[in-house]
């Protein structure tokens, strides 16, 4: 059986056209890579969390932005919201398998950023060309 090269396979797979303004992938990309969404996904890699726990973990996020980001991530199937019928309200958020995969990939990018933050400093004089 003929072995196909990865570049060939990538070209053959329909992945969307992220550069097209009407592409659904772009909408997901915008929601997934938002400042708060990235931090929420990484925080939830540690396990299920309640709203207040997430708010404390993701320092600086407002209640409104946390709720909005959680709704967007849930709408894309990256996390599950579980509500318990108790007073006071008890709501938990857990990553789905797809959410775990996305979070793992995003965490690699954030690790790279933290390792290279000094080189990425806008105040640095001359960045080295490739």
Where are these regions (language model features)?
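N-terminal helix-turn-helix DNA-binding core of bacterial DNA-binding proteins
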Residues: 15-65, 92
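Generic detection of well-ordered alpha-helical segments
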Residues: 30, 34, 38, 71, ...
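Alpha-helical linker/hinge and terminal dimerization helices associated
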Residues: 38, 42, 76, 105-120
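Basic, amphipathic "hinge/linker" alpha-helix immediately C-terminal to the N-terminal HTH DNA-binding motif
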Residues: 85-108
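Exposed, interaction-prone assembly regions rather than primary DNA-binding/catalytic cores
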Residues: 122-130
């Amino acid at each position: 059986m003929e072995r196909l090269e990865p570049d060939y396979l990538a070209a053959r797979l329909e992945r969307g056209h992220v550069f097209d303004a009407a592409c659904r992938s772009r909408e997901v990309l915008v929601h997934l890579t938002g400042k708060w969404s990235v931090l929420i996904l990484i925080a939830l890699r540690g396990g299920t969390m309640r709203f207040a726990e997430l708010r404390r973990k993701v320092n600086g996020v407002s209640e409104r932005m946390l709720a909005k980001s959680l709704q967007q991530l849930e709408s894309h199937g990256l996390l599950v919201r579980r509500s318990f019928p108790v007073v006071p309200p008890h709501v938990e958020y857990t990553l789905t398998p797809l959410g775990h995969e996305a979070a793992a990939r995003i965490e690699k990018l954030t690790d790279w950023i933290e390792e290279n933050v000094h080189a990425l400093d806008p105040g640095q004089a001359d960045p080295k060309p490739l």
